[in-house]
A protein has these predicted regions:
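Acidic, metal-ion-coordinating active-site neighborhood of RNase H-like domains
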Residues: 74-106, 131-139, 170, 197-247
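Structured helix-beta-strand junction loops
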Residues: 67, 124-125, 189, 222
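Generic recognition of stable, solvent-exposed alpha-helical segments in well-folded globular domains
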Residues: 2-9, 26, 52-59, 76, ...
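Residues at helix-coil transition
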Residues: 19, 66, 184, 220-221
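Reverse-transcribing Pol proteins
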Residues: 1-110, 189-195, 200-202, 242
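Reverse-transcriptase-like RNA-dependent polymerase core
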Residues: 16-43, 84-93, 108-110, 120-122, ...
């Protein structure tokens, strides 16, 4: 009972850190995504969206424009879009086929954590919390001079991203670099980050509250937002990214 009360008070004290609304997305203060290319990408033709899905595309475009995720473009770059079914939610995910752009992008070799290293770091911990950033990639802006390279084409026009979309080959490296830099003083001590999955781990209840407070403080200072409905607190068993379980 005391544990629940302590957690409730902690969450209330960081109320502004949490949101479920895209129009309240945070914007990382210390990093922006760059796209360095060697040449213009090959041009792929615009894909025809099935008639039954056109309203889905139209609504997604309107939502992203309204929330400043994208803007109209006059770019010479133009990658086609595609819709991918979300198995768990029964919805469609709006994606851009960035293969032409990725083929001419200079690769960022920043390392992604090894799963075994994550498992080894959790040894001895008894309490776990998993934190989910609301549309984490979108909380990192694109460098202004590189936004035109993210342009995509569809029946409703040509647009480019203001923030980092899925599908860019270097997006995982940029995001991992941001997380590792943000948590550099506590990484592997009581925080693990695998791309957009944040794990806080501790040996005692009191220690876990203290660790969560430190993490919340760092996220707040960096102007990032968590999605409360996707966060889990004080678990004794968690699913580690890429299907591994730990308890």
């Amino acid at each position: 009972m005391e544990q629940k009360e302590n957690l409730k008070n902690l969450l209330l004290s960081y109320f502004s850190l949490f949101t479920e609304n895209i129009n309240e997305l945070g914007k990382a203060k210390s990093i922006k995504h760059s796209i360095h290319t060697t040449q213009l990408p090959d041009v792929m033709p615009m894909r025809r969206t099935p008639e039954r899905l056109r309203l889905v595309v139209k609504k997604k475009i309107e939502d992203m424009l309204r929330n400043n995720i994208i803007r109209p473009s006059t770019s010479p770059f133009a990658c086609p879009i595609l819709l991918v079914a979300k198995k768990e939610e029964g919805q469609m995910r709006f994606c851009v086929d960035y293969r032409p752009l990725n083929n001419v992008t200079v690769k960022d070799r920043y390392p992604i954590p090894n799963i075994q290293l994550i498992i080894d770091s959790l040894h001895g911990a008894k309490y776990f919390s998993t934190l989910d950033l609301l549309s984490g990639y979108w909380q990192i802006e694109i460098e202004e001079k590189h936004k035109y390279k993210t342009a995509f084409i569809c029946e409703y026009g040509l647009y480019e991203f203001n923030c980092m979309p899925f599908g860019l080959c270097n997006a995982p490296s940029t995001f991992q670099r941001e997380m590792n830099t943000l948590f550099k003083d506590v990484l592997y001590e009581f925080v693990l980050v695998y791309l957009d999955d944040i794990i806080v781990f501790s040996k005692t209840r009191d220690e876990h509250i203290r660790h969560l407070r430190i993490v919340f403080d760092l996220l707040t200072k960096e102007n990032l937002k968590l999605k409360l409905s996707k966060c889990d607190f004080f678990k004794t068993k968690i699913k580690i990214p890429r299907t591994y379980y730990y308890s």
